[in-house]
UniProtKB/Swiss-Prot annotation:
Binds 1 Mn(2+) ion per subunit. Pathway: Carbohydrate degradation; L-arabinose degradation via L-ribulose; D-xylulose 5-phosphate from L-arabinose (bacterial route): step 1/3. PANTHER family: L-ARABINOSE ISOMERASE (PTHR38464:SF1). Belongs to the arabinose isomerase family. The lineage of its organism: Bacteria, Pseudomonadati, Pseudomonadota, Gammaproteobacteria, Enterobacterales. This is L-arabinose isomerase. It catalyses: beta-L-arabinopyranose = L-ribulose. Signal peptide: none annotated.
Length: 500
């Protein structure tokens, strides 16, 4: 069972009574056939539920009102099978607060050249019914997604499925609670921000709990539960000699397991699905949570270090989007560079907290090594390299008057040399279009040093996310040129300034 099993998407057909009962009967029959086929064959992440025809303003308004108040409804897919006068949709769309997609399709793929008549034309009017619907969306300044293609087309299936992921993610975000264990890393700017504005814009709440509250739960974990979890570690990971039974760091592993169990219990009891820690606020914990955080991220929790609640929330959101897709998604940080002509590279990592979902190794190494930052006992961590291939890094920043999402398309590569003295998980990548352009554009746009790294999601996914939440997006990819990028930043400043 996945999060998508908790939601459904309503399939709504727009028509009118102008064409008579026989046409409406055929419309209903076609709709039932299409919905059944999509649910059976399209591999959509969640179920489509066919709703009664929307043929009058009252019917359409009732559907939209019901969608708002049904917690299982993640959004609406609308098909204008015949012409559906768009003034009928105004009241419903005015109140609708769920994501909306127009499926611009028709029942037949090919025209029946020899038999086509006006009855056929009146029945199959998506071509101009969809345009009427599009006008009212534009007139109302209500942006909605549009997917064009025959309902049996695999590309259309993939695009609808991608939109569904965004719709479910948006509903999950409205209920997302972010727990901050301690506050921000002191004096850091980009990890701070307006939590009230974030809750208004995205729906997630951010609150702080004292580390002492967490410590109390950690200390309540039984030795039996700790030993059982360590048994799981031994089956899942390659344990270094120091972490094995009778190893000199075995106690550190036991303590890491206790912290993991305590953290998970605290998060579950509070209904949290994202959290932050900071190495400056660890009072009562014996070590900085590393292994615990890595494993919780792999289970779907959002996380970021140093109190960075925006990145923690974004990671949870992207984890939901990517559920069931190939590739992993993790907290990440641009750490250091490799400058070499035509082969500039970025080494990404963090002190400890990189999600094993992006690991190339089937069994990462579990080790305990010294960490100078934080002033605590040596922490346990998983060490691994990252899968290669196309990926993205994304950053959500607070500009005061708006949120900006930055996305850099990257290509992860194999580490050319071993890193025997680097005791943390890492990722190595080439930034698009090149490191100078990518880094300068990122810096000019105010991108954070913390990001969400993903092999599972792509630029189109993040564009949809930005559109669905009505926030600015700036893209750095192979098409980026700095003069045009700077111009776009200036234009965006004017555009969003007018919208205030």
């Amino acid at each position: 069972m996945t999060i998508f099993d908790n939601y459904e998407v309503w399939f709504v057909i727009g028509s009118q009574h102008l064409y008579g009962p026989e046409t409406l009967r055929q419309v209903t029959q076609h709709a039932e056939h299409v919905v059944n086929a999509l649910n059976t064959e399209a591999k959509l992440p969640c179920k489509l539920v066919l709703k009664p025809l929307g043929t009058t303003p009252d019917e359409i308004t009732a559907i939209c009102r019901d969608a708002n108040y049904d917690d299982r409804c993640a959004g609406l897919v609308v098909w204008l099978h015949t012409f559906s006068p768009a003034k009928m949709w105004i009241n419903g769309l005015t109140m609708l607060n769920k994501p909306l997609l127009q499926f611009h399709t028709q029942f037949n793929a090919a025209l029946p050249w020899d038999s086509i008549d006006m009855d056929f034309m009146n029945l199959n009017q998506t071509a101009h019914g969809g345009r009427e619907f599009g006008f009212i969306g534009a007139r109302m300044r209500q942006q909605h997604a549009v997917v064009t293609g025959h309902w049996q087309d695999k590309q259309a299936h993939e695009r609808i499925g991608s939109w569904m992921r965004q719709a479910v993610s948006k509903q999950d975000t409205r209920h997302l609670k972010v727990c901050r264990f301690g506050d921000n890393m002191r004096e850091v700017a980009v990890t701070d921000g307006d939590k009230v504005a974030a809750q208004i814009k995205f729906g997630f709440s951010v609150n702080t709990w004292a580390v002492g509250d967490l410590v109390q739960v950690v200390n309540s974990i039984s030795d039996g539960d700790v030993n059982a979890l360590v048994d799981e570690y031994e089956s899942c990971y390659t344990m270094t000699p120091a972490t094995q039974i009778h190893g000199e760091k075995r106690q550190n592993v036991l303590e890491a397991a206790r912290i993991e169990l305590g953290m998970k219990r605290f998060l579950e009891q509070g209904g949290f699905h994202a959290f932050t820690t900071t190495f400056e606020d660890l009072h009562g914990l014996k070590q900085l949570p590393g292994l615990a955080v890595q494993r919780l991220m792999q289970q779907g929790y959002g996380f970021a270090g140093e109190g960075d609640w925006k990145t923690a929330a974004l990671l949870r959101i992207m984890k939901v989007m990517s559920t069931g897709l190939q590739g992993g998604t993790s907290f990440m940080e641009d750490y250091t560079y490799h400058f070499e002509k035509d082969n500039d590279l970025v080494l990404g990592s963090h002190m400890l907290e990189v999600c094993p979902s992006i690991a190339v190794e089937e069994k990462p190494i579990l080790d305990v090594q010294h960490l100078g930052i934080g002033g605590k006992d040596d922490p346990a961590r998983l060490i691994f390299n990252t899968q290669t291939g196309p990926a993205i890094v994304a950053s959500l920043i607070d500009l005061g008057d708006r949120y900006r999402l930055l996305v850099n398309c990257i290509d992860t590569v194999k580490t050319p040399h071993s890193l025997p003295k680097l005791p943390v998980a890492n990722a190595l990548w080439k930034a698009q279009p090149d490191l100078p352009t990518a880094s300068e554009a990122w810096i000019l746009a105010g991108g954070a040093h913390h990001t969400v790294f993903s092999h599972a999601l792509n630029l189109n996914d993040m564009r949809q996310f930005a559109e669905m939440h009505d926030i600015e997006i700036t893209v750095i990819d192979n098409d980026t040129r700095l003069p045009a990028f700077k111009d776009a930043l200036r234009w965006n400043e004017v555009y969003y300034g007018f919208r205030r």
